[in-house]
UniProtKB/Swiss-Prot annotation:
<protein>
    <recommendedName>
        <fullName>Adenine deaminase</fullName>
        <ecNumber>3.5.4.2</ecNumber>
    </recommendedName>
</protein>
<dbReference type="InterPro" id="IPR011059">
    <property type="entry name" value="Metal-dep_hydrolase_composite"/>
</dbReference>
<dbReference type="InterPro" id="IPR006680">
    <property type="entry name" value="Amidohydro-rel"/>
</dbReference>
<dbReference type="Pfam" id="PF13382">
    <property type="entry name" value="Adenine_deam_C"/>
</dbReference>
<keyword id="KW-0464">Manganese</keyword>
<dbReference type="GO" id="GO:0000034">
    <property type="term" value="F:adenine deaminase activity"/>
</dbReference>
<dbReference type="InterPro" id="IPR032466">
    <property type="entry name" value="Metal_Hydrolase"/>
</dbReference>
<dbReference type="InterPro" id="IPR006679">
    <property type="entry name" value="Adenine_deam"/>
</dbReference>
<keyword id="KW-0378">Hydrolase</keyword>
<dbReference type="GO" id="GO:0006146">
    <property type="term" value="P:adenine catabolic process"/>
</dbReference>
<dbReference type="InterPro" id="IPR026912">
    <property type="entry name" value="Adenine_deam_C"/>
</dbReference>
<comment type="similarity">
    <text>Belongs to the metallo-dependent hydrolases superfamily. Adenine deaminase family.</text>
</comment>
<dbReference type="Pfam" id="PF01979">
    <property type="entry name" value="Amidohydro_1"/>
</dbReference>
Amino acid sequence: MKIDMNLLKRRIKVANKEVKADTVVKNGKILNVFTGDITRGDIAIVDGFIAGIGKYDGEQIIDAQDKVIVPGFIDGHMHIESTMLTPNELSKVLIQHGVTTVMADPHEIGNVAGIDGINFMLNASEKLPIDVFIMLPSCVPATSFENSGAKLDAEDLQPFYKHPRVLGLAEFMDFSSIVNLNEEMLQKIINAHLNGSIVDGHAPGLSKEELNVYISTGIYADHECANVKEAKERLELGMYLMIREGTAAKELKKLIKVVTPTNSRRCMLVTDDKLPDDLIVEGSVDHNVRLAIKEGLDPVTAIQMVTINAAEFFGLRSFGAIAPGYQADLLILDELQTVSIDKVLKKGICVVDNGEIKKEEFKINDNSKELAMKLPKINMKALEKNAFEIPLSSDLCNVIEIVPNSLITHHRVEKVDIDKGNFSASISNDQLKMAVIERHHATGNIGLGIVKGFGIKNGAIATTVAHDSHNIVVVGTSDEEMFLAVNHLKKMNGGIAIASGKEIIASLPLAIGGLISENSYLEVQEQLKILNQALSIIGVDADFNPFLTLSFLTLPVIPEIKLTDTGLFEFKRFSHIKVQA
């Protein structure tokens, strides 16, 4: 909270009714997230903060018309890069959905550009109509079993703790470094604690015994629970539970049953990774709240999970509630049950009215293009003709099987087709070739594997969004189409491309680090619409998002089997395995 003597005196005078408030919100039913009660009263706002609740007069009056007033929503864990939008463009989308604050982990751009990537995200998120707080990337690269664009050590991260919008260390995902007492990685945790900062987690598949080891370091939240058992264990051991509902990972329906009146204040709703078209149409954590209510959760509890619970976990003492001394981030809802948003006030200023952005409040210079000039371009070695060949002496192979709407994959051992000593894609068996091409240092590394579940009949999909090292990942029915899609990415300096036959039938440029578009959110939405339409041309008819699903098949810190630029990786062994079983 920024405060000085004059501001404090002015707030006291408004609270004491000696001077008028800047704005007073009248005639509303106020949700008290501390008690769960609905109360009435005028909300007096001065200098962006609430001075008091009671009977007040102000220079400006906002009539809530007997509607429900709740605190602005907080997304406690998300990645801006996954939205493919600059922070400025993203703010225009989120504010319409009542999201006034986000906790962003820039480990995507950090993996591509290191310190420059974090600086880009901090600078590009200044002075926006939402508050963007940063959790520092803890594991860049995610493991030593792949090649990222950068490496961030403890000493690289240390200076960032001085920044007022840096809150802590984000999703510590390298459990093996804790067990093996890796001092460099442990120093990152120590530095966060010494700076009085939060450390949040990423602990899929850990047993209760392993959780003891993990949590003993002072990691107190997790968003990677795959089932009710894991969720309960984390709550029992003192962790905050982040229930995730994004584009690829949809876990709310199965995990929301864990939330009870006695543990709900230790639970949050988050998005993690959500594509812009889903954000625009469906929403952010506002959608998660609606879904939780639909699944039977009390509306007050659901709203607490995206307001006061998140604020308290991250130590934001002036966020997440409607009370004196709190930032005036308010939503006026038509109904509590439907979370239908009429107005949004950010720091006391009405930025959304009747569900529409007030454009005069969004005259912000988006300097992302200029800031991105420091970020690296695609640097990949030219592909040789046989780059995607997978030699086999036996037809029994390790296969990655997609689990729809989950980041987890299944490890299958299956018989495959062989042609002239090499793996041959099988449309009938839905066994396709997949490759990960290193794109940061021109090493020439190419990891090759076999994947099933995409349902591509003729063509290839390639993208530079490939968690977490963000090399190029491509899947397809033929080497020629895979080559075409990959080379098109190089021309665009990153993005998504779909090839069919001898042509690129759809693409989305992501010129900022190969992750973020330079275009407006409406333009990106239209480009994604064209990409989605192109999926039918190559035969994809999936009930999951193929683009985000593909981008997570390269993340080795999530079970069961993934592919990096150095080869096929099995999570259980935490080591590479061969394609041939």
